[in-house]
Amino acid sequence: MVKSFRMKALIAGAAVAAAVSAGAVSDVPAAKVLQPTAAYAAETVFSQNNGASGFLPGRYDVQAMAPAMFNWSRESRFAGNTDGTLKWQNDIRTTPQNGAGAVIDGDGTVYLHSRDGEMKAFNPDGSVKWVTGNLGKTYTQSPVLGTNGVIYLASYDKKIYFIDKETGEILTTVPLSGGPSSETVIGSDGTLYFSTLDNYVHAIKPTSKSTWTERWKLKTNGVVSSVPVLAKNGTVYVGTYNYVFYAINSGTGQVKWSRTTSNAFKGYPVIDKDGNIYAGNQDGQLYAYTSTGSLKWTFPLNGFSSSSPAIDHNGNIYIGSGSGELFSISKNGDMNWSFYTDGPVRTAPLIDAKGTVYFGSDDMKVYAADANGNELWSYQTDSNVVSSPQLAEDGTLYIGSYTKLMAFGK
């Protein structure tokens, strides 16, 4: 059954009509119809700002198809080619934080961290290229691919691993004061930013494939609940479980400003080309802040949000909700459409070059919706779909559930 913005539009329209006939002023948002667009001219190499975003370009492997899960717009330069046909699946247990999932290098190798404490590298046909074990169990984090052929992975055994991308060899480890509460992100000079469960945000700089130095660490008011992101102006943004959102100078570790809300920010924020920050909160709202910390607007998500948003080249923001909805919201805070599922949407959506939006739900389905929120296809899995999707150059979609890594394509 197609569950799209159409039902939302009918309900909203009926509510508005009833309010008008009664002489009342209605604040029910109307769903907008977005005109389908052809695939736009995307970057030929990976760009964190392959949309209308304002991230600080880091030393990621730009020849990779998708070197990071977070700290970018999540608008892919590739077009998906799948109608929901499953190419292959591989048993792998994941318990991701913040919608963590796989990354893809330039030759199509897919890297994923498992709940069993293994980093696995899969060939594009689903065969296993290599496995590196004993990396820490429990929650799984997304690896990131650096420019030097090194994979960086934050692990719950209180370490950051430097792993050779080609062989899986552990090159070195960075001991941590607490288990990581976020993925690692890479700055413009190669500095790694991450947070730990003892309330610190850290900045360390690799000096080779196997050496590093600490730049700074900042004690926050509580465990960091969101993945750090870096804006073009050099600001690191994070939220905590103690309901505070921080803007931090990435060079010094000094707090620039902070704002208190009624609950915790989860996932990671996105940043638009003007420096505005958009972050979902457990209080059920999407917050929009300016780069100086002024609140622009909030948007009600009808349920808690642990989903990370994505932003497209028109400035539209896409985010999931505990209500089971995926929302498309304009940069002005107006609803374009919402798409209904039968379970919380915790994954970060992915937008392809044609405007198709891919995401997963706790109703154990993978979904694809067009630019107007109409369902294109869905696929029933055997467990909650909790890791966020990625696209390869050939249009293959990779996404994980609690039990499997799945590849969809033709």
From Swiss-Prot:
The protein, known as: Uncharacterized protein YxaL
Function: Increases the processivity of the PcrA helicase, but does not bind to DNA.
Listed InterPro entries: PQQ_b-propeller_rpt, PQQ_rpt_dom, Quinoprotein_ADH-like_sf, WD40/YVTN_repeat-like_dom_sf
A Pfam family per the record: PQQ_2
Major location (coarse): secreted
Residue ranges of coiled coil: none
Subunit structure as annotated in this protein's UniProt entry: Interacts with PcrA, Pdp, YclM, YkvL, YhcQ and YomL. The interaction with PcrA is not essential for cell viability or repair of UV-induced lesions.
Null mutant phenotype: No PcrA-related phenotype.
Secretion signal, residue range per the UniProt entry: 1-41
Keyword Acyltransferase attached: no
Alphabetized SUPFAM superfamilies for the sequence: Quinoprotein alcohol dehydrogenase-like
Cell compartments where the protein resides: Secreted
CC annotations in GO: extracellular region
Keywords annotated in UniProt: Secreted, Signal
Gene (name only): yxaL
